[in-house]
Amino acid sequence: MTRTTVLGTRALGRAALARQSLLDRSDVPVLDAVAHLGGLQAQEPQEPFVGLWSRLRAFDPAALSDLLTGRHVVRTHLMRRTVHLVTADDALAWRARHNAMLRQRVLGTYRRELDGVDLDELAAAGRAVMADGEPRSMGELARAVAGRWPEPGPRALGEMLIAALLPTAQMPPRGLWRTRAGVRNVLLSSWLGREIDPLPPDGSGPDGSGPDGSGPAGSDPVGQALVRRYLAAFGPAASADLRAWCGLAGLPAAVAAMREELVTFRDERGRELLDLPDAPRPDPDTPAPVRFLPAFDNAVLGYHDRGRIIDDAHRGLSVTGARLVLVDGRTAATWTVEDGTVRVAPLRGFSRSERAAVAEEGRALAAFLSEDDSDRVEVEAAP
């Protein structure tokens, strides 16, 4: 029997940083970076700009704004039912695979309010309203159909329509660089001029099982593509990590169908880790530069076991919207911006060299965020 290689926390952390372009900034075009990362969480509209600045050399925020207005990337509800900034191609290819999960997650919040509502009829009514191509807020769409379904209330109707039943895109100017704008939604097909890709007729159900979720599984080709893309940007990783990233139930049929093309490891807890054979797995002692992460960055949220990036004691920071600072590849501080000054709050003591490196990267971030009006940074005393 061949013994499976065990990868320690530091080795997994360095692999994650390498895949995420956080170990060494990349020179790839912005669109390619968004595609490689499988999108960026974007519920806070300005955060993807910081995420890409930390990953790309000479990142020009205007390039991302141009991709949004040019309809090459879109802001849409997708993984985990959260707003993600993804390429137009990925939005169309992946949306149908996420439909069942999106419905279930909204029902998990509004099951009582939506009891008795025929969701297919609600979807048809919402689509009819949106067919004119006019951008609408969630509330406007909900009120347009509320006469037929008065009981659920506009919030439940709007969430189900915008976040689940109708593939929609959030229109610019929301999401443009240094721009504040409310959410206005249009049908994804209207905005991109293409319908979403239908699921292949291979028998796969919503979670990669049989058509009813319990019978024989198909090969789930869309799921296989998701697995490959996830491992390229996040691996090595367990099935639970994959589910934490996308919200889908582990993609068991997809993983089973492609096992022969994957390699396996184990972590120190004994979990099986899957990976692409030729993906980078740097030496655990590879130096890791200071990096500033935006709120809700998938480098942290894209795992069930986030221990490769953040200590269990600080795990709660990753889901409350705290912006994190990585020192030696691990979460060591949080950061905010006040009046053009980047303020860093350490979670542990820094050596003199670490403090200097944090200050240097913080000055560069302040200059980026202010378009060179300020390079002020303040590093607070350690707790």
What are these regions, as identified by a protein language model?
Residues M1-R306, D312-P383:
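Long, low-complexity intrinsically disordered regions
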